[in-house]
């Protein structure tokens, strides 16, 4: 085992192996991966292997697109079959709001170059003849979507990484990580490794890895179950006749996915009441672990599946898998630099890890080698969460994020779990005046004020919500009279002392306010000249400046 290297990747699931592969592909071949047990032995091995391109986030959508494109080329590059079945994916819609959601998503897909098609119920029936389409409004299809064998994918990227010079140490547990003046020392039960960078890709062990360096990584897994059935004669007949596989089917309004598996079907619901697990982390000996199944939780979704695909109710159950999937409070992964630590990187919280692994490894390699990512990664930034994300908060929010996977994602949606966490001194007064609150960085902030008998509640919609009229009145009042703004939730800091002006002048692209008491709007740039943050800067004294920025960017900016 090496005692010195450039980068140590902690964790040998598909996410960690992808990070190693992409670092080597980027030319950084003096890199190693350490895995406490065997590759894929955490959550990768029991994943259903789906590769959904659908995502409302520009950041995550681009990670998924890159990954799907990469996986198609891996066998040619490495000689390893990854079991990628490009069978397409169909997402059904039974409601008008769901169709609105798909139309909004189509704009995201077009922007990032993902092929998506709208289907009529008759077209769905043609592709999926076992599907009951009588109550559908329509659907969307991703022709390039499908599923893959997670273990084979991981081994292919491991082979590719090794072929480029990277090394993998299995059965090597990390027992400590220490920061030095030049980098890091990763202590394992097989010896220590000195390195410049550490990447945490430890999945279910994310919080334990974080604690080694003083980080509270906001990840707690949630149980996810899926059912594998016995073979169905209609599916076997199709295979015998050489007909194509029907592909992945997602009934978003019944909140489940389904695909063919060995002549039968796989059903994976996202049910109410799925509990967080490994809240304090798995045991040190955890390996290839599953939980006791709970079919009672799945009963409504099983009924929905039988309604949509009657054949599902005509076969027996072969196996039920119930395993841990990592989650974050907003359901997006955490990919990028840690807060407060130099050259410690986080690649955790992947609830769709098989799909996102390729893209996350790609962007981390770009970030580490070249200093900046090549796409906007704000949607997966580790610093988008703060100290308010305690264990109890994470448990509640992560269960909510799991529950919302298939729910309609409205553009103005504010979720209800773990609310009233951080409130300003005038919170009660604003609430009594009709404030309808949203949450940013844990803070309750008024989105609008309900007036004239309006219900003090938001009505989420893809069209004109009631807040249009309320905000119209607010704007008119500010224009014609005066308005008050609660600044409590904004991020604030003070830069003062000798050299403060020179430091800020280097940091921002705009001119700093010259006179004491004057204010300027200034933009901080990253190393490639892109906009990192926006600050309102007030000059308090010749060598003192007061900075205000977006509340959601408190940890990112400071």
Regions found by a protein language model. Name each.
Residues 18, 177-292, 300-308, 392-414, ...:
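Flavin-dependent oxidoreductases
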Residues 24-44:
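Glycine-rich FAD pyrophosphate-binding loop
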Residues 150, 253, 262, 284-422:
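C-terminal catalytic lobe of FAD-dependent flavoproteins
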Residues 4, 82-91, 125-164, 282-289, ...:
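Helix-loop-beta segment of a Rossmann-like dinucleotide-binding subdomain
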Residues 2-15, 32:
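Beta1/beta-strand and adjacent pyrophosphate-binding region of the FAD-binding site
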Residues 141-197:
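Helical element adjacent to the flavin cofactor pocket in flavoenzyme catalytic cores
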